[in-house]
Amino acid sequence: MDEHISINVFMHYNKPMKNIIDYIKEYGNLTLEEYPFNNVDSLILSQISYIKFENSSIDIESEVHLLSEFENEIDTLCIDTRVPELNEELFIQFIHSLRYEAITISHLQTNFDKDNEKQFCAMTFHLPNQTDYIAFRGTDASFVGWKEDFNLCFQENIPSQISALNYVNNYQTKRNLILGGHSKGANLALYAGIHTHNPISCIYNHDGPGFLTPYQTDIKVYKTIPQSSVIGLLLEETTNYQIIQS
């Protein structure tokens, strides 16, 4: 059963927060040991997965690199993202914070297939607390990406779901494994987590649509839905969630 947790975790600090950049500015000096990984950290990684690392000269398909190595070309990698200047600012704040500076990235996999209406991207973030976080990118600005979103409403499976499952099944680690994503990326994380044979610690679902067929899982699922959500309520099989301000 899903455990829907509001991103109003900010209220625990008794201070108003505007966005995830503010969160890093305020709490980036706390390590993951001092304050454990939470759904805001997951949302940040999910947003960073939209950055077009596949356009970099640095190989993260077969190699492991610190995220800080991308600083000199981050403006270029953010050009094709929504609100490039905010993604760039988020990334700069991220890599220069004590909380995230040691995080590395690898296992980048992308697949854009117009004929099969498939837009897929996944990557793995290696956290210093013996945890690997697999992030699935959500819908991009392409027609194919939006068409694949539409297909979720009437198809039992879409090509990206199969790719997500294969990605997780083929991933080998002795560390704790977390899956997460935003929008369609959250749906992919949930699909892969439910069907994989690999042990999963938990899944973070940030405004992701559900499935045509209701599912059951013993894996802890944290779901966040903003007030203005449309995608996150599609095919939602339960009303047990909290709305967050957006």
Where are these regions (language model features)?
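Alpha/beta hydrolase fold serine-hydrolase catalytic domain that processes acyl esters and thioesters
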Residues: 16-40, 45-57, 63-132, 136-176, ...
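Catalytic cysteine-centered active loop of the rhodanese-like fold, especially the PTP/DSP P-loop
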Residues: 175-178, 191
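Cationic, low-complexity basic patches in intrinsically disordered or flexible, solvent-exposed regions
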Residues: 4
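Catalytic center-proximal scaffold of phosphoryl-transfer enzymes
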Residues: 1
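Short, positively charged and aromatic/hydrophobic N-terminal segments
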Residues: 7, 12-13
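Short glycine-enriched nucleophile-adjacent loop
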Residues: 189-195
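Gly/Ala-rich beta-loop-alpha elbow adjacent to hydrolase catalytic centers
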Residues: 181-185, 189
